[in-house]
């Protein structure tokens, strides 16, 4: 794209990569038109990462986020609480990662684990030690209720998710679900204006030391 001088902007879903550590790689990504990245972190706890069958390296994730910030690429990090057998302490690892790296993370999306129909976990219930509640009357259901043998219950994860937005979410500029809209905005105005707009539209943010500098 750079060689052909296409002059286009792009965004993508991505996972944190140990192969994306060199500054030159990030310089080239921005030069090619990358303006935002949507990371599926899911969890920052090593045991849960392995259960998810991901190879996320947390230290590499920090470098990815720092390099993206340096070149002007917006990073949106997606996580959830309540993967089967996850304990309160393991969930806290994810919360701690987000809070400690808030200066590198422009926006965050937190949720709780949902057992979707046809998801790999659905077919490995014994391995993940969950009891899936399949109601024959709900044949069009897209997800199922389940109970784990250990760890947080679904209700525990939902409560923790709600507390995150009530108690921890303040330092972030926006809760972004309309990613295409944000992408279009960033391509025109850059990454720094969104936090400023948040403070402008939410004057009470200053009461919590939520300056634009703290949120980007």
Which residues does each predicted region cover?
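Conserved SAM/AdoMet-binding glycine-rich loop
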Residues: 1-75, 81
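A structural motif corresponding to the C-terminal end of an alpha-helix
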Residues: 4, 32, 63-75, 101-104, ...
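Short, charged helix-to-loop "capping" segments that act as catalytic/coupling loops
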Residues: 16-22, 97-109
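Soluble or luminal CAZymes and related metallo-dependent hydrolases
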Residues: 21, 60, 86-93, 152-160
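Catalytic cores of alpha/beta
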Residues: 24-27, 84-100
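Short, hinge-like loop/turn segments at secondary-structure boundaries
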Residues: 28-29, 55-56, 94-96, 125-128
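Flexible glycine/acidic-rich beta-alpha junction loops that bind and position SAM and/or redox cofactors
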Residues: 47, 51-52, 81-89, 101, ...
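Radical SAM enzyme core and accessory elements
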Residues: 139-216
